[in-house]
Amino acid sequence: MVKYSREPSNLTRSAKAYGAYLRVHFKNTYETATAIKGMLVKDAKRYLNDVIDRKRCVPFRKFRGGVGRCAQAKAFKHTQGRWPEKSCKFLLDLLKNLESNAEVKGLEQSKLRLEHVQVNRAPVGRRRSYRAHGRIIPFLSHPCHVELIAVEDEDHVPRHTPTEKKVVKMNKRELARMRLRTGRALS
C-alpha cells in the first residue's frame, strides 16, 4: 500500500490513484498536473486529449526557462506553454485508474473533482554517453511519482439573497468622494 501525502476531505466519497517511478519528465508532468488540478475528471480528460491534439496548451509557470511562447497560453493568462504528449498520456492512464477505483466504490463518475494532484521527483536514472577524445558524460532521466485524489462533488444549496436593501454607512470623506464621482448630492 502506498502512503499518500494527505488524506481526502471525505474518505467515503473519494477515490485515489498513484503512479510510482514513472519514466516521464518530472518538470513536464508537474506543469501538466498543475493545469488539471481542481477540474472535474471528465473535463481533465478532455483537456489532456486536446493537448495531445495540440488544440490547447499546458501553461509553463514554474519550470519555464527556455520554454517558447504560444498564443494558446493566453487562455491561462500566461505567455509560455508547450504540448507535453507523454505526460498527458501518463496522466490519462492514471485518470482512467482513478475512475475505475471510484466505480468500485460506487461513486458517480460525472461528479468527480480532482481535489489533490501532486508530482514528486523519483530517483534519477543514470546512464552514460561516450563523447569525443575519450570523454564520458552523464545521461540522466528524471522520473516522477504522481498521486491523484478525486472527491465526489456535493450538491450545493444556492445562497440566500436578502430582499431588504442594505443601508451603507459612509464617513464624511467617502460621502464627499461619492458626491464628486456622481455629480449630485446623496440624501
From Swiss-Prot:
- Pfam families attached to this UniProt entry: Ribosomal_L22
Output the Gene Ontology cellular-component terms: cytosolic large ribosomal subunit
Keywords attached to this Swiss-Prot or TrEMBL record, sorted alphabetically, are: Ribonucleoprotein, Ribosomal protein
GO biological process terms held by the UniProt record: cytoplasmic translation
User: Key word rRNA processing present in the record?
Assistant: no
**Coiled-coil intervals, chain numbering:** none
Gene Ontology MF annotations: structural constituent of ribosome
Entry similarity comment? Belongs to the universal ribosomal protein uL22 family.
- What this protein is called in its record is Large ribosomal subunit protein uL22
Species whose genome carries this gene: Theileria annulata
In the UniProt record, what gene is named as encoding this protein? Answer: RPL17
